[in-house]
A protein has these predicted regions:
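Membrane-proximal envelope and lipid/glycan-remodeling enzymes
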Residues: 6-538
Length: 538
């Protein structure tokens, strides 16, 4: 499948509608086939490097799976009978609870994410074909744009995180497609309205685009669609708020409260303005932030050329509002995932605006724009090419560390344990897991945000839950660990996506030293290559 094969589907827009759809389907099938081959190779290599098992590139995916299991049992959190909100998404744990109900395990979120990636590709192809971007374009340009599309939405690497981000990208792009339909005087489809409603439910940062899209629909005279979407969003958020209140949990999940700078500033009563300023500075110096700002500037510049096109200006304004929201409040990276949705939005919006601008340009000028167009899109997509190349190594890295920690807790030392990196240790573990970082433990989260968390609180919580062992990153605890804990081993692993290469194993006063030693000695010989357990105390 060559670039020429992708571009060969071009034809005059004056052709009949059914012919257009046939050509679109052919092009979409070609680009989907390319994506499928790339993703299949990625998956096979990742499984091979992870000891023949499906292991996601981030341990966070298993937090959602643990929450999904508790949802099926009538709870919410990672431990039976204890409520917490470690999930960064409102709806994602419920979606994968359905796949957990049929015992799909990790394949459940992977299938949802892969389907979302494929649907996003189709949505973008339909949108770009419909707006005429490919008209009179050479096959090399069409092919290059199509291949770049695969990576600018991170359709190869992102599903392997096992998280909600691929679904978020789909909802973002589909919402934009609904705005593009409104710009042509058509009401958004039911699917496009559903995508808009899902935005804040999939990821909280989706609220920025959701609000901007609602305003844009009103300005584009699609008030009925805007009212319906707004009512559904309000109902869903109210239901979620009522659920959290009933469980005694905060409205925002622990992951947001502990990670977002501006939220942390609000809870700690420090200057929120300073937190936003810090985020703006980060956006200027962060490679992902720089790419986002460049795409935002491209959208703004193209919109200026289209200043007589009211619908285009309205949509550009909505996109820039979402971009600005992420620049001011959003996060970047964390293995190439936090910013993908807004990078994809800005890129697709820019291509759509360029398509509206082209008929107003001299043919030579339009041709001259092709090179900078591809250069900027390629520059924006490159980190996700790198992510695709790194994904098998990242999957192996999680297998080498968190997967082995989970094995130790479930198979070798079947007692309550404490960790600071929740996920595989908690997933399908019948014993209590204390999260010393606070995502899955409300007392820890509250103590950290109150500024009263240290060795004494760690010791008290461990004693309260009869925790016998702790597996932690020492550097995450600058105040140290309780003096009563004894370091008994260190797990040495390579460093790719894990937060630290060495995991310290501590024995608490409640543990039986002989039992701990037996478990460690039985565990050590079972570790995969390039992973070692140094037993310090016997």
């Amino acid at each position: 499948m060559t670039i020429e094969a992708i571009g060969s589907a071009d034809a005059d827009r004056s052709a009949a509608s059914d012919g257009l759809m046939a050509r679109l389907t052919r092009r979409s099938l070609v680009i989907l086939s390319i994506w499928f081959v790339l993703f299949a190779v990625e998956l096979i290599v990742s499984i091979n490097l992870a000891g023949g098992r499906l292991v996601f590139t981030l341990d966070d995916a298993y937090i959602h799976l643990a929450v999904a299991d508790q949802i099926l049992s009538g709870g919410y959190g990672v431990n039976p009978g204890e409520f917490s909100s470690p999930s960064s998404s409102i709806i994602w744990p419920y979606l994968i609870a359905a796949t957990e109900a049929v015992h799909l395990g990790g394949w459940g979120p992977l299938l949802i994410s892969a389907a979302a990636a494929a649907a996003t590709i189709v949505t973008i192809m339909r949108l770009l074909e419909g707006c005429g971007l490919f008209d009179a374009a050479g096959s090399w340009l069409v092919g290059a744009l199509c291949v770049t599309t695969i990576f600018i939405i991170s359709a190869v690497a992102l599903p392997m995180t096992g998280l909600e981000h691929s679904l978020h990208v789909w909802a973002t792009v589909t919402t934009f497609a609904g705005l593009a339909a409104a710009a042509q005087g058509r009401a958004p489809s039911g699917l496009q309205i559903a995508a808009l409603v899902l935005l804040p439910l999939i990821r909280f940062e989706g609220a920025a685009l959701a609000c901007a899209a609602l305003a844009a629909l009103v300005l584009l005279r699609q008030r009925r669609a805007a009212a319906l979407a707004a009512a559904l969003i309000a109902a869903a958020l109210l239901a979620y708020a009522a659920r959290m209140h009933a469980l005694g949990l905060p409205l925002l999940p622990s992951s947001v409260l502990l990670k977002a700078r501006f939220v942390e500033a609000a809870y700690e009563r420090t200057a929120a303005f300073s937190a936003v300023t810090d985020n703006l500075i980060l956006s200027l110096i962060n490679p992902y932030g720089q790419r986002l700002l460049l795409l935002g500037m491209a959208v703004a510049a193209t919109a200026c050329w289209l200043r007589g096109d009211r619908p285009a200006l309205i949509i550009a304004g909505a996109v820039l509002a979402a971009v600005g929201g992420h620049v001011a409040f959003g996060q970047y990276d964390w293995f190439h995932r936090y910013e993908v949705y807004v990078i994809a939005l800005a890129a697709v919006a820019w291509l759509w605006l360029v398509a509206r601008l082209r008929p107003n340009l001299d043919a030579r000028v339009a041709t001259a724009l092709n090179a900078p167009l591809l250069m900027l899109l390629g520059f924006a997509a490159w980190p996700y090419v790198a992510a695709a190349l790194a994904t098998p190594l990242a999957s192996r890295n999680i297998y080498q560390q968190q997967y082995q920690m989970g094995r130790f807790a479930r198979e070798f030392y079947r007692h309550p344990v404490a960790v600071n990196d929740l996920g595989l240790v908690a997933y399908r573990n019948p014993n209590y897991v204390l999260d010393l970082w606070g995502l899955g433990s409300e007392p820890v989260r509250k103590a950290k945000l109150a500024g009263h968390y240290g060795p004494a609180e760690m010791a008290a919580l461990a004693a309260q839950h009869a925790v016998d062992m702790a597996m932690i990153y020492d550097r995450w605890f600058p105040q140290g660990v309780p003096a009563s804990w004894t370091k008994v081993a260190v797990l040495h692993t390579p460093f790719v996506t894990v937060a630290a290469g060495d995991v310290a194993f501590y024995r608490t006063p409640d543990a039986d030293p002989a039992e701990v030693t037996r478990a460690l000695e039985a565990f050590a010989p079972t570790l995969p290559p390039n992973v070692a357990l140094d037993i310090l105390s016997r």
